[in-house]
Amino acid sequence: MRISTAYEGALGDYFAGNATDGPYNAHTDRPAMLELAGDVTGLRVLDAGCGAGHYITELRARGAAEVVGVEGSARLLDHARDRVGDDPAVTLHHHDLEEPLAFLPDDSFDLGVVALVHHHLEARRELLAELHRVLRPGGTLLLSTVHPTADWIWHGGSYFDEDRVETRFGDSGATNSYRRMTMQTFLGELLDTGFALERLVEPRATEAARRVDEARYLKTLRTPFFVAVRMRKDAG
């Protein structure tokens, strides 16, 4: 599935709004990923699949020296431009993540962030190889995706199914698809690329999610919706 078709039109607008204060993106995934990032002061960061720019503004606020955002959805990139404004330390690229990141040089980023995008792609291994290439030796990759257990509970079948499934976004009526994967597949592809695992977390929603949607907040306390990892490129 081409990422350029994933969040266009009304779906892109819905996602941009929901990611601002929704229980899952804003109050489950993002706090966990930013905690995994630690101190980003002075770092050059790649946000692959930057969406509406929420991570970009957070990373800049936390001291990142420069952030490069790459996004396949033109609609989401418009939202990102509006959110980022005229920050000279931010560069945005409209680019399909199914394709190589040929416009980015080798060993040029301290930190890569891939938040809830990698499960939409068919060329996952190719993207991971590109991320490994553009990170500096000793650089860090943060990656989050849908938790395999949540997929099994929501979509049924076998835990080991790795088919494409369709998901509905809240009460909006909007739908999208992504590919399920087991934990073995998820971690195996990262390790096969040459990354070393430093930390894995299964985020629970923060208390702020209760204010937004208590029912969905409580769901995250029973079922792990996402899994997030901190990986390291060998310093060589």
Regions found by a protein language model. Name each.
Residues T193-F195, E214-G236:
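Core SAM-dependent methyltransferase catalytic element
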Residues S177-L200:
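Short alpha-helix
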Residues L46-A48, A52-P100:
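Class I SAM-dependent methyltransferase SAM/SAH-binding core
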